[in-house]
């Protein structure tokens, strides 16, 4: 299992942003599938992934003990051991940090790739984000970065080295990477100043220098933190290249749910997993239901946002979708390694499927049913759009 990765579609060697929720979910599934003799973890540089390593090792040693509390309480115990009562303030900031990185890792924010023949992937370019999405993400980064800074001011000097290494550096360096690339994206379209992107680049260098120098540890870890692994283009200062194209705007869904917000059904909540930490696992043969109402449409476009995983049994990863107990439409979202769809699933941590479903009547409530066929189905989010929205949504990301 990898919590650090070198390869396509893009490395993540810098910060330990791998989702503990995903690690917990997938190793639990492996354990339940009978894989209990040997687990191997690829950690790369040990320092950035200290918590993920501890979670993995504790699950391997005694899965039942970790399961008795869940990974968040396990993480809280880790933080309490290191920071005492301050852990209560740190925990929500770190879980939000992991959530943002689950949506898009800091190393992915430049829309570049590794091991691609097309040279366009070596150039930093726009992500398919609207201005609203960009500003919302930067606001989230600012909030946790500011709170981490405030806690650090009251941290005991003896604890500053570990606080900086475990909390402040990963949260603030990740935030600055987002600022560097998102301000650049806005600046390309005349919506921000290039100087803000450049300042974020300088901040990353300054934070890294502090990490390596240390506070009272005599430079024990000097040189271990490199903020430009493999000197990939995404780590560079962003070239000032204006764009004549407007920032994209995307359709707003008529309805949007996280998996756990289903009206009814049989599911298992996946602690802390998903874009809003509300994904659910649906066992084969079980279903979840979402109620909605339309006024005039005779059909709806359903967008399924699923956790991208490999098939557990065989080659398929199937579910079915239906409305009002009607025909079940089969959906298979299994992918093959190194395919374009697989790469997009890795970069965005969601597998997308869109399907237009007919409605028998308008102006009344309808029930959308999502039923798992194969083992491994995890539903993160479900959205309903007007059928005509499909072309614009395909511009954001193909399904």
Which residues does each PLM region occupy?
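Substrate-binding groove of N-acetylhexosamine-processing glycoside hydrolases
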Residues: 1-259, 365-366
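Extracytoplasmic
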Residues: 221-399
């Amino acid at each position: 299992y990898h919590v650090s990765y070198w390869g396509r579609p893009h490395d993540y060697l810098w910060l330990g942003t791998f989702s503990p929720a995903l690690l917990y979910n997938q190793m639990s599934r492996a354990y339940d599938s009978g894989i209990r003799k040997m687990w191997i973890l690829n950690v790369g540089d040990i320092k950035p992934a200290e918590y993920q390593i501890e979670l993995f090792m504790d699950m391997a040693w005694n899965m039942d003990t970790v399961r008795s509390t869940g990974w968040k309480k396990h993480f809280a115990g880790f933080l309490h051991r290191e920071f005492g009562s301050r852990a209560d303030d740190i925990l929500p900031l770190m879980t939000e940090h992991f959530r943002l990185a689950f949506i898009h890792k800091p190393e992915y924010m430049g829309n570049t790739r590794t091991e691609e023949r097309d040279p366009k992937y070596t150039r930093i370019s726009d992500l398919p984000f609207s201005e609203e999405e960009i500003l919302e993400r930067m606001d989230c980064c600012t909030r946790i970065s500011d709170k981490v800074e405030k806690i650090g001011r009251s941290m005991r000097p003896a604890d500053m080295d570990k606080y900086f290494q475990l909390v402040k550096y990963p949260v603030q360096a990740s935030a600055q990477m987002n600022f560097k690339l998102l301000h650049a994206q806005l600046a390309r379209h005349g919506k921000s100043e290039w100087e803000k992107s450049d300042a974020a680049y300088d901040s990353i260098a300054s934070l890294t220098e502090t990490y390596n120098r240390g506070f009272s540890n005599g430079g024990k870890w000097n040189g271990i933190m490199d903020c430009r692994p493999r000197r990939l283009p995404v780590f560079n200062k962003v070239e000032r290249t204006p764009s004549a194209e407007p920032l994209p705007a995307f359709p707003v869904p008529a309805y949007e749910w996280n998996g756990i917000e289903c009206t009814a059904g049989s599911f298992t909540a996946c602690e802390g997993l998903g874009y809003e930490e509300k994904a659910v696992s649906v066992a084969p043969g079980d279903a979840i239901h979402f109620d909605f109402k339309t006024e005039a449409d005779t059909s709806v476009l359903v967008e399924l946002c699923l956790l991208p995983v490999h098939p557990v049994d065989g080659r398929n990863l199937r579910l079915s979708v239906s409305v009002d107990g009607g025909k079940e439409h089969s959906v298979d979202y299994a992918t093959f390694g190194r395919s374009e769809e697989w790469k997009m699933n890795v970069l965005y941590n969601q597998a997308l499927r869109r399907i237009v479903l007919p409605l028998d009547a308008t102006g009344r409530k309808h029930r959308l049913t999502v039923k798992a066929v194969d083992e491994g189905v995890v539903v993160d989010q479900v959205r309903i759009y007007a059928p005509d929205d499909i072309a614009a949504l395909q511009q954001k990301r193909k399904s």
